[in-house]
């Protein structure tokens, strides 16, 4: 039931002028589902995030103590006269959740914390050697296992008192000595308690007290002595016993849980035993990551058909027979073992390739000559290229070097835990027949089903009731926002922006907060129409809890479901920033000034092409694609067409294109890429000569990167300024107008315009440079003008303004025109690229690629290009795509937007569901052919609703 509006129940905004907003006044109803829409760059985010949310955050920070604020940075007051009725604000944006490889969907949602509690409290330990469930062990059972060790074995019985704890433990050592003990095992080394034991207080230590040293004799006296020692240990450690053997290995026993047949025992079941971020539970080899970075032969050997002299070994390809010490050492190996340099790598025998990669087992003569001419001869083992890469990757302190060596490495599943992340003890505990990691590998849908069907006894039900309820609730929230195809083991860094946002949305629903203002940025991104209504219902649940939802959105279904719709425009950039229309969706549709309203009412629409492209008759065929959930499928992609890859979320679209097609073609065309086991065969790669992936990844990560530098138009602009009369008189070259080199840039901020303040434990904070006032250049450089504008003034222009300004300069105006053509006319030339959305970054890349002359044999790959685009902007994008296809090129697009799908020349629909139930081709053909397959395809069902009958 929707809450009734009260006359004074509004967020009142007066005089909003942030960015391009033109003194906007608006009353936004509280406790409602409010959508802000408008063309890209019209000012939606400026109103929602930079004004309303920013003011909410500023007021929150103002309420904190000055001590707390120093760690959170300053929050400037947005350019607005007044905001009244503002509730506590929470922003749910599209930023990736975490880049930490330890963060998973389970940890960021905190569901894994509840799972650890559940497995620790009601899980049942099982012997990994197949001896059934493990029960608690008696002292005599443990003594029997120690007594059964080989006769005359020398063992030491230890009491583990400190496990992975920091400190110097001086008082503990004194206490042990007072109790009459003589020795301790500290971090694997035996000390007497008379020794001065100095420990680093910041390092984690393991300490065990030596209770007895025994030679195993098969007599009653030895057995009694073992029992007495175990009883002493039990009093010190609550049942944990260690036995140190002669060879240094330690046997672990526990009164808590142990197998009476093979002696396997585990420590007390605690939640931290199941944490892959805890030293207690994480695998000792991979430290809980589940993988390790190892050199990859396929990346080290660029092309096995080439010889070493021809550059087959990638790291040596530019220094073959040069003076590099690395090459000279390698040449010593080659000469010693007579490995031919002119023979293709694939023709070398296995032992020769092993020497190249793994090095020599014996010392060999290594000859080198330094740059100064000094000769050096040493006899030593040559470590091999693979070991060289691994060592330097670990040792380097340079991020650039680490990334360079990373290019020759791959993630390899941990050979000890086999990707399970946890130690054997934790994995031996089962609930419903599976371990905790196996549960996290189930899809959200299947994990809910598993928990609902879980059979527990009365005691387990009582203990686990609350944790089970919380887990099922949180999993259900994830399902309701369309993430049922994911699993809790999914690494957070691999989630898309839309998926990460919906996870945060589900987390907020679980918090059951009321009276909050939620500001969201396109939550429908990456969501199939099938799941869209579930997302809308979820947002309505949040509204019905008594919250205000302020959603920036372009999706028609979401706009029509809103209680209140705000249209900002009428256009983008300086031509936007006005309140065009507001009210119910019906009221906005009736407003003739609203472009959004015209699209919603059907008065304006993206037209269906009368004739679809017939293509050039050539194809690329992928056979046996089997990455992730792909079911060994064969896919045919027709060329010189707009090919749409569709399907529900998680159906395998990215697996097919981004993880199979793209790397396969890059391997063939550019001699780079991944191993061939992701598919069986690819046919027709010779039908293209180039593949261009236009992704939504950032185009730069520093304040110096901007659209002008990325598309190379800034070089031309700098040349123009350097050729002015005043610049020539002063002797300025084009480098004077670069903020990347000394000379013309500000010496205080080094051309950044901002000063970076390291926060150590928090993200770095950037503040405007007080010397240049954010203008990046020194005052002398800014004195040079072209048609009355300084270089900084030009960077402040929008793409459209700059196009008009430089219209008479063809090499500049042509590049700027392309930015306008892809719908970025509003974008500031000098904007920091870290502020760009994924969709904006994608379109900037597209405009750069369009600068190059087409060969007619290029394959473009776009991943959800509709992200951040209004229907009017989609129209512009489709015009560009049609231009590409007319040049003879091919465009492959992963997309959910029906307005793009309906103009496709060919559609490949994957499904039928997401996750394990996806990965198959359910329908394919032209849109007209697809809608005849509605019984098999969700996409076809929704597409049939918008295709006009007379177009079929």
Swiss-Prot record:
Domain ABC transporter: 316-595, 615-944
Molecular-function annotations in GO: ATP binding; ATP hydrolysis activity; DNA binding; excinuclease ABC activity; zinc ion binding
One Pfam family here: UvrA_DNA-bind
PROSITE patterns reported in the protein's UniProt record: ABC_TRANSPORTER_1, ABC_TRANSPORTER_2
UniProt keyword terms in alphabetical order: ATP-binding, Cytoplasm, DNA damage, DNA excision, DNA repair, DNA-binding, Excision nuclease, Metal-binding, Nucleotide-binding, Repeat, SOS response, Zinc, Zinc-finger
Domain of life, per lineage: Bacteria
InterPro entries: ABC_transporter-like_ATP-bd (IPR003439), ABC_transporter-like_CS (IPR017871), ATP_grasp_subdomain_1 (IPR013815), P-loop_NTPase (IPR027417), UvrA (IPR004602), UvrA_DNA-bd (IPR041552), UvrA_inter (IPR041102)
Residue intervals of every C4-type zinc finger in the record: 259-286, 746-772
CC per GO annotation: cytoplasm; excinuclease repair complex
Keyword Transport on entry: no
Cellular compartment(s): Cytoplasm
Extent of the signal sequence: none
Entry annotated with the keyword Oxidoreductase: no
Gene3D superfamilies the record matches: ABC transporter ATPase domain-like, ABC transporter ATPase like domain, ATP-grasp fold, A domain, P-loop containing nucleotide triphosphate hydrolases
One example of a Gene Ontology biological process annotation: nucleotide-excision repair
Transmembrane parts of this sequence: none
Binding of ATP, residues: 38-45, 647-654
Family from the record: Belongs to the ABC transporter superfamily. UvrA family.
Subunit structure: Forms a heterotetramer with UvrB during the search for lesions.
Alphabetical list of PANTHER family matching this protein: UVRABC SYSTEM PROTEIN A (PTHR43152:SF3)
Task performed by this protein: The UvrABC repair system catalyzes the recognition and processing of DNA lesions. UvrA is an ATPase and a DNA-binding protein. A damage recognition complex composed of 2 UvrA and 2 UvrB subunits scans DNA for abnormalities. When the presence of a lesion has been verified by UvrB, the UvrA molecules dissociate.
Protein name: UvrABC system protein A
Organism phylogeny: Bacteria, Bacillati, Mycoplasmatota, Mycoplasmoidales, Mycoplasmoidaceae
């Amino acid at each position: 039931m929707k809450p009734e509006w009260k006359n004074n129940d509004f967020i009142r905004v007066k005089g909003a002028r942030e960015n391009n907003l033109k003194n906007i006044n608006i009353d936004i109803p509280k406790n409602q589902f409010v959508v802000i829409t408008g063309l890209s760059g019209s000012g939606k985010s400026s109103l929602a995030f930079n004004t309303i949310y920013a003011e909410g955050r500023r007021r929150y920070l103002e309420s904190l103590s000055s001590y707390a604020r120093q760690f959170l940075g300053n929050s400037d007051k947005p350019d607005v006269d007044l905001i009244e009725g503002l509730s506590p604000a929470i922003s749910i944006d599209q930023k990736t959740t975490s880049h930490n490889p330890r963060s998973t969907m389970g940890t960021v949602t905190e569901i894994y914390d509840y799972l650890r509690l559940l497995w620790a409290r009601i899980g049942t330990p099982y012997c990994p050697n197949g001896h059934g469930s493990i029960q608690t062990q008696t002292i005599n059972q443990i003594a029997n296992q120690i007594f059964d060790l080989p006769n005359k074995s020398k063992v030491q019985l230890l009491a583990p008192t400190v496990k992975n704890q920091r400190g110097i433990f001086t008082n503990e050592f004194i206490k042990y000595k007072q109790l009459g003990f003589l020795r301790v095992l500290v971090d694997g080394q035996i000390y007497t308690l008379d020794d001065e034991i100095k420990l680093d207080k910041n390092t984690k230590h393991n300490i065990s007290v030596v209770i007895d040293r025994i030679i195993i004799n098969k007599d009653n006296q030895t057995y009694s002595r073992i029992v007495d020692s175990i009883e002493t240990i039990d009093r010190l450690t609550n049942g944990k016993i260690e036995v140190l053997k002669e060879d240094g290995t330690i046997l672990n026993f526990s009164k808590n849980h142990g197998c009476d047949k093979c002696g396997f025992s585990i420590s007390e079941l605690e939640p931290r035993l199941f944490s892959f971020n805890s030293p207690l539970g994480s695998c000792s080899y991979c430290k809980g990551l589940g993988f390790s970075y190892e050199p990859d032969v396929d990346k080290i050997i660029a092309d096995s058909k080439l010889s070493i002299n021809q550059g087959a070994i990638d790291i040596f390809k530019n220094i073959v027979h040069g003076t590099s010490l690395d090459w000279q050492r390698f040449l010593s190996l080659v000469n010693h073992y007579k490995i031919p340099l002119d023979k293709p790598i694939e023709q070398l025998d296995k032992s020769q390739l092993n020497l190249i990669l793994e090095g020599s087992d014996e010392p060999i003569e290594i000859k080198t000559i330094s740059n100064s001419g000094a000769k050096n001869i040493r006899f030593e083992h040559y470590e091999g290229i693979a070991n060289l890469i691994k060592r330097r990757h670990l040792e380097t302190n340079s991020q650039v070097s680490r990334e360079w060596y990373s290019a020759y490495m791959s993630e390899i599943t941990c050979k000890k835990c086999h990707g399970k992340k946890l130690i054997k003890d934790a994995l031996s505990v089962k609930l419903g027949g599976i371990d905790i990691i196996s549960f996290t590998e189930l899809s959200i849908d299947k994990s809910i089903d598993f928990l609902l069907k879980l059979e527990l006894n009365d005691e387990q039900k009582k203990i686990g009731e609350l944790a089970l309820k919380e887990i099922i609730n949180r999993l259900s929230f994830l399902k309701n926002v369309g993430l049922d195809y994911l699993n809790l083991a999914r690494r957070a860094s691999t989630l898309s922006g839309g998926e990460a946002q919906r996870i945060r949305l589900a987390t907020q629903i679980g918090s059951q907060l009321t009276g909050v203002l939620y500001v969201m940025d396109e939550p429908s991104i990456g969501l199939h129409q099938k799941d869209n209504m579930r997302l809308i219902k979820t947002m309505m649940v949040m509204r019905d809890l008594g919250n205000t939802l302020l959603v920036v959105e372009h999706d028609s279904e979401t706009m029509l479901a809103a209680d209140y719709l705000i249209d900002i425009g009428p256009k983008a950039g300086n031509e936007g920033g006005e309140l065009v229309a507001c009210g119910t969706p019906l009221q906005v549709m009736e407003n003739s000034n609203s472009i959004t309203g015209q699209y919603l009412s059907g008065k304006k629409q993206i037209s269906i092409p009368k004739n679809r492209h017939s293509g050039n008759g050539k194809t690329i065929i992928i056979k046996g694609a089997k990455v992730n959930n792909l079911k060994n499928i064969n896919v045919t992609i027709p060329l010189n067409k707009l090919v749409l890859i569709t399907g529900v979320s998680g159906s395998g679209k990215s697996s097919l294109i981004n993880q199979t097609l793209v790397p396969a073609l890059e391997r063939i065309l550019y001699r780079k890429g991944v191993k061939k086991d992701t598919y069986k065969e690819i046919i027709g790669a010779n039908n293209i000569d180039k593949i261009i992936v236009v992704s939504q990844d950032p185009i730069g990560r520093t304040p110096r990167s901007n659209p002008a530098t990325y598309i190379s138009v800034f070089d031309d602009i700098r040349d123009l300024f350097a050729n002015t009369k005043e610049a020539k008189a002063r002797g300025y070259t084009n480098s004077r107008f670069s903020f990347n080199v000394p000379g013309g840039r500000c010496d205080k901020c080094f051309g950044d315009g901002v000063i970076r303040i390291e926060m150590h434990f928090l993200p770095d904070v950037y503040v405007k440079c007080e010397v240049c006032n954010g203008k990046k250049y020194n005052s002398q450089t800014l004195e040079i003008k072209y048609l009355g504008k300084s270089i900084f003034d030009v960077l402040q222009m929008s793409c459209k303004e700059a196009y008009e300004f430089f219209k008479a300069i063809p090499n500049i105006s042509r590049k700027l025109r392309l930015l306008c053509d892809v719908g970025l006319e509003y974008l500031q030339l000098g904007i920091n690229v870290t502020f760009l959305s994924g969709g904006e970054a994608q379109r900037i890349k597209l405009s750069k690629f369009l600068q190059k002359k087409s060969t007619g044999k290029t394959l473009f790959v776009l991943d959800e290009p509709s992200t951040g685009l209004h229907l009017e902007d989609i129209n512009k994008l489709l015009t560009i795509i049609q231009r590409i296809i007319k040049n003879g090129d091919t465009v492959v697009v992963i997309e959910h937007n029906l307005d793009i799908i309906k103009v496709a020349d060919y559609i490949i629909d994957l499904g039928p569901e997401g996750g394990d139930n996806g990965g198959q081709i359910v329908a394919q053909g032209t849109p007209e052919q697809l809608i005849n397959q509605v019984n098999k395809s969700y996409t076809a069902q929704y597409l049939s609703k918008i295709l006009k009958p007379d177009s079929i």
